[in-house]
Amino acid sequence: MKNKDYPLRSSMDELSTKNDNEIDLEKGPLPEYNSEDGSTLPPYSEIWKYIKTVSEDSSTGPTEIANPNVERRQEFKDSHPNIYSLLRLLISVLAVIVVFFTAWVCVNPLEKSIFGKVAFSVTIGITCPIVFIVIFCFFETWTQAVAQCIKVTVIFLAQCVKVTAVFLAKCVKVIAVGLYNSKKDLVVTIWLAWVVICFILFGCVKDGRLNLNKALICSTCSISAALFFILLLVCIPIWTLKHMLFGLFQVLGVQSCVVIVTKGLMYLFDKHIDATGYEIEASSLFVIGNFLFFYEMERPGALKRMPKFIGNGIASFLGGLGNAFGGIGNAFGGIGNAIGRIGNAFRGANDNNDIPLGEMDVESEV
């Protein structure tokens, strides 16, 4: 019998041997791993990679966030050193000049005594070089400080503006809600103020102390427009701007119609537009404005319904006139019928008077 020799290595051993013989061209041959030393790890293991990354991060330390403005300034300084130095010198000289002239204007040493002039000269002689040295030598430091101060100031002002705008918006909202809830009392107050203003204007014009002429009607229209603008702001919610403007234009339209009709009547009756004409015109607007004012106050939204109301009123008026004329016609018809009946009665009486006497005797005997 022949003895068969079987290999003592398994397939896993062959695979590991094959992997050991292969060399990674990027990493190079693997160094020998000392299993007896517990502190040594394979250089390409995952734990080794992690430890190496952490050690590199700790050695470099925390990275600072670069300021783009500082980087740009440093780049400009490195690329143009002469221009940068000249700029520093120019700014330093300008600062010294500003300090000198400010001190000169505030103190005015020419009006001082000799001791005052000497003190001023010594003070300026010490202050100006210090200012020049500080600005020139610490240019980057104070420019960064000024830039940071400006940035903080701008942010603070923006926050103040934002807070103020929010506060004013809330105040306007609260005032609008308050006006809407207490509109009747406020409307009466506005109306009384408007009446007082109009009477003051009319009184001044009447006494001759104020010669407005054409300005009178314009001022009256302006007062009326402002009044109804406030009125519509109060009676109608503030966010319905379309309805408010619609009502305002309606009031102005009514006032314009009154002005046109008044002037037309004055020209029709050969009445020239003078002070009296303007008083009549303004009084008409005053009466119309008061009527519309109270009507709108008692029935909010009346101005919006005014065209339909006027149309219905005109239709009702014409219908009433038609019914009146129809009634008058019916009355005249009734009178005609009564007159006809009276005529028939008279005709019957005349027919009875024309009967002969012999026929009357026969009828009586029968």
Curated annotation (Swiss-Prot):
Any GO BP annotation: meiotic drive
Protein role: Promotes unequal transmission of alleles from the parental zygote to progeny spores by acting as poison/antidote system where the poison and antidote proteins are produced from the same locus; the poison component is trans-acting and targets all spores within an ascus whereas the antidote component is spore-specific, leading to poisoning of all progeny that do not inherit the allele.
One family name in Pfam for this protein: WTF
Start and end residues of each stretch annotated as Disordered: 1-39
Protein name, as recorded: Meiotic driver wtf4
Membrane-crossing residue ranges in chain numbering: 89-109, 119-139, 149-169, 185-205, 221-241, 245-265, 275-295, 309-329
GO CC entries: ascus epiplasm; cytoplasm; endoplasmic reticulum membrane; fungal-type vacuole; vacuolar membrane
The keyword Endoplasmic reticulum is assigned to this record: yes
UniProt record similarity statement: Belongs to the WTF family.
Biased composition (Basic and acidic residues): 1-29
Keywords, ordered alphabetically: Cytoplasm, Endoplasmic reticulum, Membrane, Toxin, Transmembrane, Transmembrane helix, Vacuole
Subunit structure: Homomer. Forms protein aggregates. The two isoforms can interact with each other and with themselves. High sequence similarity is required for their interaction.
Organismal lineage: Eukaryota, Fungi, Dikarya, Ascomycota, Taphrinomycotina
Top-level taxon in the UniProt lineage: Eukaryota
